[in-house]
Protein backbone atom coordinates (compact mmCIF):
# COMPACT_ATOMS: atom_id res chain seq x y z
CA UNK A 1 0.00 0.00 0.00
CA UNK A 2 1.11 3.54 -0.66
CA UNK A 3 0.18 4.39 2.94
CA UNK A 4 2.72 2.07 4.61
CA UNK A 5 5.45 4.18 6.22
CA UNK A 6 7.24 1.25 7.88
CA UNK A 7 6.58 -2.45 7.46
CA UNK A 8 8.09 -5.90 7.65
CA UNK A 9 8.68 -7.87 4.50
CA UNK A 10 7.65 -11.50 4.89
CA UNK A 11 8.75 -13.83 2.13
CA UNK A 12 5.86 -16.05 0.98
CA UNK A 13 3.40 -14.30 3.28
CA UNK A 14 0.35 -15.79 1.59
CA UNK A 15 1.77 -19.32 1.70
CA UNK A 16 2.67 -19.00 5.38
CA UNK A 17 -0.78 -17.74 6.36
CA UNK A 18 -2.98 -19.85 4.11
CA UNK A 19 -3.19 -22.68 6.67
CA UNK A 20 -4.71 -20.28 9.18
CA UNK A 21 -7.24 -18.73 6.85
CA UNK A 22 -9.58 -20.83 4.72
CA UNK A 23 -11.73 -18.96 2.26
CA UNK A 24 -14.50 -20.28 0.10
CA UNK A 25 -16.94 -22.92 1.26
CA UNK A 26 -14.56 -24.38 3.84
CA UNK A 27 -14.27 -21.50 6.32
CA UNK A 28 -12.75 -23.91 8.84
CA UNK A 29 -10.75 -21.25 10.60
CA UNK A 30 -11.78 -19.20 13.61
CA UNK A 31 -10.38 -16.05 12.03
CA UNK A 32 -13.70 -14.92 10.62
CA UNK A 33 -16.60 -12.89 11.92
CA UNK A 34 -20.28 -13.11 11.25
CA UNK A 35 -21.82 -10.64 8.82
CA UNK A 36 -23.80 -8.85 11.54
CA UNK A 37 -20.57 -8.21 13.50
CA UNK A 38 -18.88 -6.93 10.34
CA UNK A 39 -21.80 -4.55 9.81
CA UNK A 40 -21.60 -3.38 13.43
CA UNK A 41 -17.84 -2.80 13.47
CA UNK A 42 -17.70 -1.04 10.12
CA UNK A 43 -21.08 0.71 10.38
CA UNK A 44 -22.09 -0.58 6.96
CA UNK A 45 -25.67 0.54 7.45
CA UNK A 46 -26.61 4.17 7.91
CA UNK A 47 -24.58 7.35 7.79
CA UNK A 48 -21.18 5.74 7.21
CA UNK A 49 -22.23 2.99 4.81
CA UNK A 50 -20.02 4.42 2.08
CA UNK A 51 -16.84 3.62 4.08
CA UNK A 52 -14.56 1.65 1.73
CA UNK A 53 -12.82 -0.24 4.55
CA UNK A 54 -15.60 -2.84 4.57
CA UNK A 55 -16.53 -2.77 0.90
CA UNK A 56 -15.16 -4.36 -2.22
CA UNK A 57 -12.28 -6.73 -1.79
CA UNK A 58 -11.38 -5.95 1.84
CA UNK A 59 -13.35 -8.97 3.09
CA UNK A 60 -14.30 -12.32 1.67
CA UNK A 61 -18.01 -12.76 2.36
CA UNK A 62 -19.73 -16.12 2.52
CA UNK A 63 -23.40 -15.16 2.45
CA UNK A 64 -24.58 -18.74 2.79
CA UNK A 65 -22.75 -19.16 6.11
CA UNK A 66 -23.25 -15.48 7.05
CA UNK A 67 -19.57 -14.90 7.78
CA UNK A 68 -16.71 -12.76 6.51
CA UNK A 69 -12.93 -12.79 6.68
CA UNK A 70 -10.43 -9.99 6.28
CA UNK A 71 -8.19 -10.41 3.26
CA UNK A 72 -5.57 -7.84 4.30
CA UNK A 73 -2.84 -10.44 4.83
CA UNK A 74 -4.01 -13.10 2.40
CA UNK A 75 -4.17 -10.91 -0.70
CA UNK A 76 -1.01 -8.93 -0.07
CA UNK A 77 1.06 -8.93 -3.25
CA UNK A 78 3.81 -6.82 -1.66
CA UNK A 79 4.22 -9.36 1.18
CA UNK A 80 4.41 -6.52 3.71
CA UNK A 81 3.07 -6.54 7.25
CA UNK A 82 2.53 -2.86 8.11
CA UNK A 83 4.05 -1.54 11.33
CA UNK A 84 2.97 2.06 10.86
CA UNK A 85 0.77 3.59 8.19
CA UNK A 86 -0.21 7.12 7.26
CA UNK A 87 -3.68 6.95 8.89
CA UNK A 88 -2.06 6.11 12.22
CA UNK A 89 0.06 9.26 11.94
CA UNK A 90 -3.12 11.29 11.45
CA UNK A 91 -4.70 9.62 14.50
CA UNK A 92 -1.61 10.30 16.61
CA UNK A 93 -1.69 13.95 15.50
CA UNK A 94 -5.41 14.10 16.30
CA UNK A 95 -4.82 12.85 19.81
CA UNK A 96 -1.77 15.04 20.41
CA UNK A 97 -3.30 18.31 19.23
CA UNK A 98 -4.59 20.83 21.77
CA UNK A 99 -6.62 22.59 19.06
CA UNK A 100 -10.06 20.93 18.73
CA UNK A 101 -10.52 22.13 15.15
CA UNK A 102 -7.14 20.79 14.07
CA UNK A 103 -7.77 17.55 15.96
CA UNK A 104 -11.06 17.00 14.12
CA UNK A 105 -9.38 17.86 10.81
CA UNK A 106 -6.84 15.06 11.30
CA UNK A 107 -9.38 12.33 11.99
CA UNK A 108 -11.78 13.58 9.31
CA UNK A 109 -9.01 13.61 6.68
CA UNK A 110 -8.74 9.83 7.02
CA UNK A 111 -12.52 9.38 7.14
CA UNK A 112 -12.94 11.41 3.95
CA UNK A 113 -10.19 9.41 2.18
CA UNK A 114 -12.10 6.26 3.15
CA UNK A 115 -15.20 7.48 1.35
CA UNK A 116 -17.14 9.04 4.21
CA UNK A 117 -18.73 12.31 3.13
CA UNK A 118 -17.53 15.61 4.62
CA UNK A 119 -21.13 16.14 5.69
CA UNK A 120 -20.55 13.28 8.18
CA UNK A 121 -17.39 14.79 9.71
CA UNK A 122 -16.99 14.23 13.44
CA UNK A 123 -16.26 16.82 16.10
CA UNK A 124 -13.49 16.52 18.68
CA UNK A 125 -14.66 19.36 20.94
CA UNK A 126 -13.97 17.43 24.16
CA UNK A 127 -11.50 14.75 25.18
CA UNK A 128 -14.36 12.23 25.33
CA UNK A 129 -15.57 13.06 21.80
CA UNK A 130 -12.02 12.80 20.47
CA UNK A 131 -11.44 9.37 22.05
CA UNK A 132 -14.86 8.15 20.88
CA UNK A 133 -14.10 9.24 17.30
CA UNK A 134 -10.65 7.66 17.40
CA UNK A 135 -12.05 4.45 18.92
CA UNK A 136 -14.40 4.00 15.98
CA UNK A 137 -11.69 4.82 13.46
CA UNK A 138 -9.01 2.59 15.02
CA UNK A 139 -11.57 -0.23 15.11
CA UNK A 140 -12.17 0.08 11.37
CA UNK A 141 -8.74 1.11 10.11
CA UNK A 142 -6.72 -1.40 12.11
CA UNK A 143 -9.06 -4.39 12.18
CA UNK A 144 -6.94 -7.45 12.94
CA UNK A 145 -3.85 -5.38 13.76
CA UNK A 146 -1.96 -4.66 16.96
CA UNK A 147 -2.46 -0.90 16.69
CA UNK A 148 -6.11 -1.35 17.70
CA UNK A 149 -5.15 -3.38 20.77
CA UNK A 150 -2.58 -0.75 21.73
CA UNK A 151 -5.20 2.02 21.46
CA UNK A 152 -7.59 0.08 23.72
CA UNK A 153 -4.88 -0.63 26.28
CA UNK A 154 -3.58 2.95 26.26
CA UNK A 155 -7.05 4.32 26.99
CA UNK A 156 -8.12 1.59 29.42
CA UNK A 157 -11.02 0.54 27.20
CA UNK A 158 -12.39 -2.81 28.37
CA UNK A 159 -15.63 -4.69 28.04
CA UNK A 160 -16.74 -2.66 25.04
CA UNK A 161 -15.48 -4.91 22.29
CA UNK A 162 -17.89 -6.56 19.91
CA UNK A 163 -18.44 -10.21 20.91
CA UNK A 164 -15.64 -10.14 23.49
CA UNK A 165 -16.45 -10.88 27.13
CA UNK A 166 -15.11 -8.61 29.84
CA UNK A 167 -12.38 -10.32 31.84
CA UNK A 168 -11.07 -9.21 35.21
CA UNK A 169 -7.39 -9.91 35.70
CA UNK A 170 -6.32 -10.70 39.24
CA UNK A 171 -2.78 -10.25 40.43
CA UNK A 172 -1.51 -13.43 42.10
What kind of feature is each model-predicted range?
Residues 1-23, 45-172:
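Acidic/polar-rich alpha-helix caps and helix-coil junctions
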Residues 27-42:
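Short, cationic low-complexity segments
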